[in-house]
Regions:
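Terminal targeting signals and extreme-terminal segments of soluble enzymes
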Residues: 1-72, 78-96
Length: 96
């Protein structure tokens, strides 16, 4: 079951067009990953000797978020391999 993080879009997240700046989505996703890990998994990862390093991110931007939107970020650990883990995240609007 995915962990859910809620983000409210604020004015300082926006670019000149009134959309969330693409770099801000990376911050939102990172905050959601930390929410998942701090929810009880972080100590286990550290005990196993995993270094929590992002080596690849693939993003499909489907529609812009704007000021006042409330976003839900679903985060789940998809696979844990000997040298890597795959975390899957999806951002949706709270009302959708």
């Amino acid at each position: 079951m995915p962990h859910c993080t809620e983000i409210k879009v604020r004015g300082y997240h926006l670019d000149l067009y009134g959309h969330v700046n693409n770099a801000r989505y990376l911050e939102f996703l990172e905050a959601a990953r930390w929410d998942l890990l701090e929810g009880g998994n972080l100590a286990w990862f550290m005990q196993q000797g995993y270094a929590l390093v992002v080596s690849r991110i693939d993003i499909r931007y489907l529609r812009p978020a704007t000021m006042g939107d409330t976003l839900q970020i679903a985060t789940r650990l998809d696979r844990l391999l000997p040298r890597a883990g795959i975390i899957v995240q999806q951002i949706t609007w709270q009302d959708n």
